[in-house]
């Protein structure tokens, strides 16, 4: 086991090394040279990478870092509650999305009142809504389908075969009920965000406060001592506790730093390549850039599912959706206000209001699918088809491939209505399951609060 584990770690690190060399030669060494007071010039070969070369190098770094990140999270489950380890993984995996959105929010504040500032505010919202819809439309739906149809799915205890066409389901861990309820609260609030003229301090207080409450609850959860790992996590979990914790921290820090530095040039490289073949820049920023920034998360989830840990994979996706739907939205107004030099609402136009409503409506429908702690092939396909059809229809309108009697904004509102109607029907038909879910979550929160300052114990304790 030791040789195979070290070989896997070495292979993952090797994928990241080209980008480490580029960053070291073009950013780190020049900074050190300037600090030390002498001149340094990066090699021309590394300083002038072509767009395609940049995409390849950064893409490999993202791939390798995603594996390191997944191993760190799985190893950490020996010492902290699984939900908390996955929450850390989720935040680190989507850190680049925060960075890209923060950049647009900063520009919106720095250039407030100008066309550039107005556009930046709209781009911040477009990037955020694109990322959130990708996470459900491709992430939740795609992983459910991959879990059921992948080779060896019969050995996955989460996959349940049922009679009927496309009736097989992925059964989810009931422990994710907490995340589902918190996500529902954030979703209901999100419907109200556009009504205030933009993202304001009340949005920040509620959404960030909601996520802080969630973290407070899961931190008081119990460590699961019987988690059966194989491969790299099993090897690392055999380390003595101090060495194990140090290794986890190192893996989280290294992979998180590489993902943070690599995804932005990876996304921009994809944008440039897309624009070169005629794809509009706004469309690229809303869809291609977020897809690139979500790539580490999706890679981690596919890795977990491939190990027959589909429940952990879904937990990671739901945790990512929760932190992006709370922390990401809530912190945009903070960044905008810092750039502005005073408190200010992050404003956006009506089309972006429609984007937020559509994103909230999609989330509402997706949550309705999960309240029985399972998702079928039919339901996953419905999520995927609704998502893809809206994106392709909007793209066709932008490119004037089709002519419709409605605008792109009207399409957003129509799809929002479809999601809300479908979600409402499901909530009504599954009201008993929803009631049980709420009661279970209330009990979980009550138990966590009643433990006071008690901390979870390591599996070694």
Model features per residue range: what roles?
Residues 1-461:
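Hydrophobic alpha-helical segments, chiefly the membrane-spanning helices
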